[in-house]
């Protein structure tokens, strides 16, 4: 642990004089003199000083500043106030204190929350991380003024604690009475307060070691530094590392809480910008012009070269990396430009490998899994601070990936409650929190790339895609594209895949030694707030194409060149900036194809539809066409871009491949076989029933409440074979007579109403013909003849309303 040296007055004045000489650089370059004048003109009170400049001018003082921060910063701030007073005395009286912020190269003191140990206490350190929690901004009293009405005196009191630079904190007791127990009144207008906020930063997920929880550290922000950051921001904090004693009751425990008292907060870029040189820009322009016809195909072919096949999926992922155009309309509505993709398929079809490639290629990507993520873990959570008890807002994965990509593996393993939480993020690009007295809105403008397995583990070809997917339509419509990746048995394709995988295992990177373990995602860390080698990186040459390797690229033709990963990142970064506009021709084509997709969706029910065709599909077509135009570095979305977008949507929505047609034929053959078997079984049962009826006794009646026999027996009850030929002739004569009688519709309706009354009065399901005739013609002006009754009953029999058997009418 670095020992803290308490400066006496002589050393403090000497340090103050050294810092004043450093700021007064009029005879040198006048950098800080100009900065102080700008500070006065901008009405600011914090000066940003580079440690590199101080190290060049006074190396001894710079080392003392880094190792003994509290006393040195107090001297530095006093020197700044004296220097401001020498330039503008009236401005120096406006503020009680002026503050110093540091930047530059900190060397070994440029750390992460994991490497921030006790040896850095009382030192100036620079910590990188992601903001995960932010407390509310609260006023903190610095000086209170109290008035005593009895004595007519005014009492002033200053407050300092361990979060200030003063070496000895004062008592925190707020005075209410003077020495003579006279009550005091607080003069709030004369009291001085400062803003106070506490944030928590967590180490970068890409720098955290695998298998270990990410570390975090609390940062205290005061005055002008508050509200500079929000959850999800990647920042560099320069400040003093200090320990605070942990109190339990009236005693101080042996464990200490450490905080970082910030003096400068620098926001790192949302998009990690690669270093561009003039040569890189020239190569990007040349590549887009020379390959203007097939630039999209070339980039998609070079995407994830270690994965064989999946051409349409690679094109879609390239569109996801490029993105559409985000629009904020005048009426306040938001149209997202991010593209969301869902990959569903059998195991071992490289879904997770495609996700991993996006993690390495996208400028900002956050990986999560379905089982290891909750709804609030993906969006945002409101937590309670253990010490103060106040509410805090904690950012989730989608908020941390703002302006980036969220890769969710095992998407089907999430619960429905957790999946519902991301609905707003996927469409509106923001997270709205309204709970525990906190109403906040966080930006989460990120693309979602999810991978999932079908409901049955493997894709069942005899079920519809919607049954295999098993996700609700409200979620599927938010995905722009949904790809079904099948593991099909094709000897030729299997041979190509096996050859490709074996070549990947035989490849060894240049300079790799035998038995060396390769570090995952290792890179050189820059131990400064600014990249000192930025100009040197600019001069490095970026190759457009990869050097041909027989193991990596196989025995392909020399014409099929692979774009290098470094050039791909730079090209995508430049292409994302372009905002192409729709032409009239492409807009008309997209509208026509959208209406055709809707009609195709409603007309052909046997088509293998993967997701619903809604109004969001129209926006999907526009986003995909815009991304294709970005790949061409075009300022307009032309007809060829719209055609490519429609082709992608047709492939993803309807799966128009030959295998699907074979499956439909096979399914139809199976259905015809089933129908033949059913017909045979029906014939067999009818023959059995005929045999039973021939052996039945004479006069045996049909029981309408016996459902043991099938419905096919019912029409045979009309003409039982046990009846003699005389009854058959009578029945035939009756039917002939009924056919001769002409019935009018009012007459038929009257008969139906009278028949219903007869059944209701009898409270039975069957009535004899004689009783029926008497009941219908009772008290009727125009009675029904027997021919009319037979005609009405035959009409109702044809409509399956009644059944007549052996002089008994049954109500169906």
UniProtKB/Swiss-Prot annotation:
Modified residues (N-acetylalanine): 2
Post-translational modification: Acetylated by MCM3AP. O-glycosylated (O-GlcNAcylated), in a cell cycle-dependent manner.
Principal location listed in the UniProt entry: nucleus
Keyword Nucleotide-binding: yes
UniProt-listed SUPFAM superfamilies: Nucleic acid-binding proteins, P-loop containing nucleoside triphosphate hydrolases
UniProt binding sites for ATP: 664
Biological processes annotated in GO: DNA replication initiation; premeiotic DNA replication
Arginine finger, short sequence motif: residues: 477-480
Superkingdom field: Eukaryota
MCM domain segment(s): 295-502
Subcellular location: Nucleus; Chromosome
Region span, Disordered: 664-744
A Pfam family hit: MCM_lid
Residues that bear N6-acetyllysine: 293, 547
Stretches with biased composition (Basic and acidic residues): 720-744
Annotated ADP binding sites: 353, 393-395, 397
Compositionally biased tracts (Acidic residues): 670-681
Modification type Phosphothreonine: residues: 719, 722, 729
UniProtKB keywords: Acetylation, ATP-binding, Cell cycle, Chromosome, DNA replication, DNA-binding, Glycoprotein, Helicase, Hydrolase, Nucleotide-binding, Nucleus, Phosphoprotein
EC number: 3.6.4.12
GO molecular function ontology, one term from the record: helicase activity
Cited function: Acts as a component of the MCM2-7 complex (MCM complex) which is the replicative helicase essential for 'once per cell cycle' DNA replication initiation and elongation in eukaryotic cells. Core component of CDC45-MCM-GINS (CMG) helicase, the molecular machine that unwinds template DNA during replication, and around which the replisome is built.
Homology family: Belongs to the MCM family.
Subunit note: Component of the MCM2-7 complex. The complex forms a toroidal hexameric ring with the proposed subunit order MCM2-MCM6-MCM4-MCM7-MCM3-MCM5. Component of the CMG helicase complex, a hexameric ring of related MCM2-7 subunits stabilized by CDC45 and the tetrameric GINS complex. Associated with the replication-specific DNA polymerase alpha. Interacts with MCMBP. Interacts with ANKRD17. Interacts with MCM3AP; this interaction leads to MCM3 acetylation.
Name recorded for this polypeptide: DNA replication licensing factor MCM3
Originating organism: Mus musculus
């Amino acid at each position: 642990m670095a020992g803290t040296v308490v400066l006496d007055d002589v050393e403090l004045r000497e340090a103050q004089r050294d810092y004043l000489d450093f700021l007064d650089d009029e005879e040198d370059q006048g950098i800080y003199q100009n900065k102080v004048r700008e500070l006065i003109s901008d009405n600011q009170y914090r000066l940003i000083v580079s440690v590199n400049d101080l190290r060049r001018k006074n190396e001894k003082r710079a080392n003392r500043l880094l190792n003994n921060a509290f006393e040195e910063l107090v001297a530095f701030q006093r020197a700044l106030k004296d220097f401001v007073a020498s330039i503008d005395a009236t401005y120096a009286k406006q503020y009680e204190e002026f503050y110093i912020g540091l930047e530059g190269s900190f060397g070994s003191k440029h750390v992460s929350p994991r490497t921030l140990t006790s040896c850095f206490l009382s030192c100036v350190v620079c910590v990188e991380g992601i903001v995960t929690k932010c407390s509310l901004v609260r006023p903190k009293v610095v000086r209170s003024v109290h008035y005593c009405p009895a004595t007519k005196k005014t009492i002033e009191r200053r407050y300092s604690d361990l979060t200030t630079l003063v070496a000895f904190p004062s008592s925190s007791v707020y005075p209410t009475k003077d020495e003579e127990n006279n009550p005091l009144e607080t003069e709030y207008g004369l009291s001085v307060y400062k803003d106070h906020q506490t944030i928590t930063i967590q180490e970068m997920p890409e720098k955290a070691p695998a298998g270990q929880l990410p570390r975090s550290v609390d940062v205290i922000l005061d005055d002008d530094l508050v509200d500079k950051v929000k959850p999800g921001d990647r920042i560099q904090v320069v400040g003093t590392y200090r320990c605070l004693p942990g109190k339990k009751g009236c005693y101080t425990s042996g464990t200490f809480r450490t905080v970082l008292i910030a003096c400068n907060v620098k926001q790192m870029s949302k998009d990690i910008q690669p270093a561009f040189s003039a040569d890189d820009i020239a190569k990007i322009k040349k590549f887009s012009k020379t390959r203007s016809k097939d630039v999209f195909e070339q980039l998609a072919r070079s995407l994830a070269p270690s994965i064989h096949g999946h051409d349409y999926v690679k094109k879609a992922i390239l569109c996801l990396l490029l993105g559409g155009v985000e629009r904020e309309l005048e009426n306040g509505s938001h149209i997202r430009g991010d593209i969301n993709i869902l990959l569903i398929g059998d195991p071992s079809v490289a879904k997770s490998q495609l996700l991993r490639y996006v993690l390495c290629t996208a400028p900002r990507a956050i990986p999560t899994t379905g089982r290891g993520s909750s709804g609030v873990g993906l969006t945002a959570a409101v937590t309670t601070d253990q010490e103060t008890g106040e509410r805090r807002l904690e950012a989730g994965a989608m908020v941390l990936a703002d302006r980036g990509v969220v890769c969710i593996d095992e998407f089907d393993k999430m619960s429905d409650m957790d999946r519902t939480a991301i609905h707003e993020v996927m469409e509106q690009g923001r997270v709205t929190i309204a709970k525990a007295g906190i109403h906040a809105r966080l930006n989460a403008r990120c693309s979602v790339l999810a991978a999932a397995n079908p409901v049955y583990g493997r894709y069942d070809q005899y079920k519809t895609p919607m049954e295999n997917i098993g996700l609700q339509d409200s979620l599927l419509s938010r995905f722009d594209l949904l790809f079904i990746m099948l593991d099909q048995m094709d000897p030729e394709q299997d041979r190509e895949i096996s050859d490709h995988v074996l070549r990947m295992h035989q490849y060894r990177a240049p300079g790799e030694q035998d038995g060396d373990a390769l570090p995952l995602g290792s890179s050189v860390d820059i131990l400064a707030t600014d990249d000192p080698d930025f100009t040197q990186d600019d001069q490095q040459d970026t190759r457009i194409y990869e050097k041909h390797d027989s193991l990596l690229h196989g025995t392909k033709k020399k014409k099929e060149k692979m774009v290098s990963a470094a050039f791909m990142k730079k090209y995508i970064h430049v292409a994302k900036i372009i905002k192409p506009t729709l032409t009239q021709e492409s807009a008309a084509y997209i509208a026509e194809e959208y209406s055709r997709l809707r009609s195709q969706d409603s007309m052909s029910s046997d088509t293998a539809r993967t997701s619903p065709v809604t109004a969001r599909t129209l926006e999907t077509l526009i986003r995909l066409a815009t991304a294709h135009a970005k790949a061409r570095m075009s300022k307009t979305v032309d007809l060829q871009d719209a055609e490519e977008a429609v082709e992608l949507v047709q492939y993803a929505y309807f799966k128009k491949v030959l295998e699907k047609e074979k499956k439909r034929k096979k399914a139809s053959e199976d259905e015809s076989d089933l129908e033949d078997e059913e017909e045979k079984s029906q014939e067999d049962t009818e023959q059995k029933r005929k045999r039973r009826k021939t052996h039945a006794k004479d006069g045996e009646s049909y029981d309408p409440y016996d459902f043991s026999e099938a419905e096919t027996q019912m029409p045979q009850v009309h003409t039982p074979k046990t009846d003699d030929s005389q009854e058959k002739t009578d029945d035939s004569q009756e039917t002939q007579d009924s056919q001769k009688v002409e019935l009018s519709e009012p007459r038929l309706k009257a008969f139906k109403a009278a028949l219903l009354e007869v059944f209701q009065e009898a409270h039975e399901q069957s009535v004899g013909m004689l009783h029926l005739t008497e009941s219908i013609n009772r008290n009727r002006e125009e009675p029904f003849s027997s021919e009319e009754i037979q005609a009405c009953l035959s009409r109702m029999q044809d409509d399956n309303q009644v059944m007549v058997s052996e002089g008994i009418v049954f109500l169906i």
